[in-house]
């Protein structure tokens, strides 16, 4: 442990960030006040390699699950700004509840037409980390709904799937309006046909 008031435990661990903690095997905690546990983590290393001051853009907590020095990776990561990354499936037995109170929001604008943009997106079936999955491609989403796509430090894109819900709601409402318009036109045509049939019958 080389950082001020830092602690390193386990095998070949490094705690170079001030007030940091590293425990496990080849775990490295170089961000200020960061905690790293596990094996060969890839996050938690600052540019200076020994952070001495706090920053919300730094890593707060990491669980490393890398195989070796050439294959470092993280199972779980929490940033000081609250951003959290889980590198595999998340199983939840209860509900996932997201804050959505209008009092927490500003510059609220009703979402306009989304159906044309939604039709530009294709659902995909693909393999990811050895598992068969169904979803969308972030690059396609970014072209029509860029606000739903984020990029990490490695330039990898991620999609806010929850943000697609209001998009789907508006698209469904648009489709419903079109169906009602078609239904009205059909009924009008039926009425015209009935009037024409009565007219022909009276002529006979």
Where are these regions (language model features)?
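Periodic small-residue-enriched repeat registers in elongated scaffold domains
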Residues: 1-87
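C-terminal intramolecular chaperone/autoprocessing and neck/assembly modules of extracellular spikes
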Residues: 82-162, 171, 175-204
């Amino acid at each position: 442990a080389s950082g001020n008031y830092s602690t390193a435990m386990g095998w070949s661990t490094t705690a170079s960030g001030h007030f940091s903690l590293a425990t496990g095997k080849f775990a490295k905690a170089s961000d200020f006040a960061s905690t790293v546990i596990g094996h060969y983590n890839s996050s938690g290393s600052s540019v200076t390699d020994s952070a001495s001051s706090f920053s919300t853009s730094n890593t707060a907590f990491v669980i490393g699950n890398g195989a070796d020095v050439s294959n470092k990776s993280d199972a779980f990561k929490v940033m000081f700004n609250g951003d959290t990354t889980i590198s595999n499936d998340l199983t939840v037995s209860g509900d996932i509840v997201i804050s959505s109170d209008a009092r927490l929001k500003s510059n609220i604008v009703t979402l306009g037409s989304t159906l044309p943009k939604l039709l530009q997106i294709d659902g995909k079936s693909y393999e990811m980390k050895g598992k068969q999955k169904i979803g969308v491609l972030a690059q396609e989403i970014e072209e029509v709904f860029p606000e739903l796509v984020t990029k990490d430090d490695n330039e990898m894109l991620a999609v806010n799937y929850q943000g697609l819900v209001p998009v789907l709601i508006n698209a469904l409402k648009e489709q419903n309006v079109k169906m009602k318009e078609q239904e009205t036109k059909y009924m009008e045509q039926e009425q015209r046909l009935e009037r024409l049939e009565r007219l022909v019958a009276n002529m006979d």
